[in-house]
């Protein structure tokens, strides 16, 4: 049986993967997190003595994508699937431009040219398409046409649920990329939760928040998420470092109970302390506790009402955070209304902005903002 790192017998009809002098992996993350992914990847590669990898961000011209090449003997595949900041890691097979007309026929023709001996060794396959951009076709149209081309060529059965191999035929605006994922489900879907709110933070974003916070995994420190929701940020923090003391709070007691259930399922009940409380009254929730880091995803107005005054809301929580933070502590938060947060920061004068990055999270495109608490002389 082949190990994960054995070269797969896949070709584009022109170049066989096993004949290339390098390993290739195509990474897909949330647009805007390219540098976070690159930094995480470089750290992982250096731990394995790969000091000169070829990492290209936005290789096809789009955010959220990286193309990685390493020497053939390096375990790139095993390294890629351990990354916390990505959704997918693919072995890239082929990519091509889409014509303005008859795009589906062109996709079917290009996929039909591929030499994929792997399909001769399995009982079933499926085609999965992720699509960004505006087109006159849908993702399932691509899946049907590409799947039909491969079925005609190899005769391998199509099984949408219990397939042996998944061929990704992804559409990025005007470019089609064909690849085989190194994993069965998105790498960001790593927590099985009994309690899952309708709007939940992806684990990849949670990892990015911790990275933006410059939290030293070798140092003992305390971390609070005062809008903890289902607990994703704290679960990711528990993996990030065993030296962190973790606290979570939420205004909704039902949410707190759900987060506790999730922590129990993940065997993290001894590592995270949850408490019910309003972040706008943090001094009463944690009257004696001070934190080195606050990492959180404040609500976008859904749980505090659609007519939430964001500027007033941000001013209030920034003030409350300041009192419960140690000198020189950091805050990392997601801000849907950056202009309102910016005004609140200016009016309070309690923090220095360290970093700001806009991230495409699908339906919303908020900013991740990293802050440093400013020490006051009267403190």
Task: Provide a role label for each language-model segment.
Residues 150:
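Active-site periphery "cap/insert" segments of enzyme catalytic domains
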Residues 2-75, 113, 132-133, 137, ...:
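Class I S-adenosyl-L-methionine-dependent methyltransferase catalytic core
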Residues 62-117:
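Conserved AdoMet
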Residues 119-135:
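Short glycine-rich, basic-tinged beta-strand/loop micro-motifs
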Residues 115-121, 170-171:
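Short glycine/proline-enriched loop/turn "hinge" motifs that connect secondary-structure elements
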């Amino acid at each position: 049986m082949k190990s994960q790192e054995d070269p797969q017998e896949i070709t584009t009809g022109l170049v066989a993967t096993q004949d290339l002098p390098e390993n290739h992996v195509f990474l897909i993350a949330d647009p805007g997190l390219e540098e976070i992914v690159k930094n995480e990847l470089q750290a992982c590669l250096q731990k394995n003595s790969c000091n000169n990898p070829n990492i290209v961000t936005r290789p096809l011209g789009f955010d959220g994508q990286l193309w990685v090449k390493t020497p053939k003997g390096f375990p790139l595949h095993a390294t890629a699937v351990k990354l916390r900041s990505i959704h997918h890691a693919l072995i890239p097979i082929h990519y091509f431009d889409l014509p303005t007309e008859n795009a589906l026929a062109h996709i079917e023709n290009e996929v039909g040219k591929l030499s994929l001996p792997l399909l001769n060794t399995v009982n079933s396959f499926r085609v999965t398409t992720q699509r960004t951009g505006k087109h006159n076709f849908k993702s399932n149209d691509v899946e049907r046409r590409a799947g039909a081309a491969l079925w005609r060529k190899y005769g391998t059965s199509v099984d949408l649920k219990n397939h042996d191999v998944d061929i990704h035929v992804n559409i990025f605006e005007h470019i089609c990329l064909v690849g085989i994922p190194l994993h069965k489900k998105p790498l960001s879907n790593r927590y099985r939760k009994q309690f899952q709110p309708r709007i939940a933070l992806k684990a990849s974003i949670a990892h990015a928040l911790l990275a933006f916070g410059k939290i030293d995994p070798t140092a003992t420190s305390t971390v609070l998420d005062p809008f903890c929701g289902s607990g994703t940020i704290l679960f990711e923090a528990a993996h990030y470092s065993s030296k962190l003391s973790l606290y979570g709070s939420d205004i909704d007691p039902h949410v707190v109970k759900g987060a506790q259930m999730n922590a129990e399922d993940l065997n993290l009940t001894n590592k995270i302390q949850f408490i019910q409380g309003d972040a706008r009254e943090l001094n009463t929730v944690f009257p004696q506790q001070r934190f080195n880091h606050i990492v959180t995803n404040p609500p976008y107005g859904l749980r505090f009402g659609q007519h939430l005054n964001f500027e007033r809301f941000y001013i209030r929580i920034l003030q409350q955070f300041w009192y419960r933070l140690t000198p020189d502590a950091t805050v990392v938060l997601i801000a849907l209304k950056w202009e309102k947060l910016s005004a609140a920061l200016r009016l309070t004068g309690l923090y220095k902005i360290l970093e700001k990055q806009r991230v495409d999270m699908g339906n919303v495109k908020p900013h991740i903002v990293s802050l440093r608490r400013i020490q006051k002389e009267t403190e």
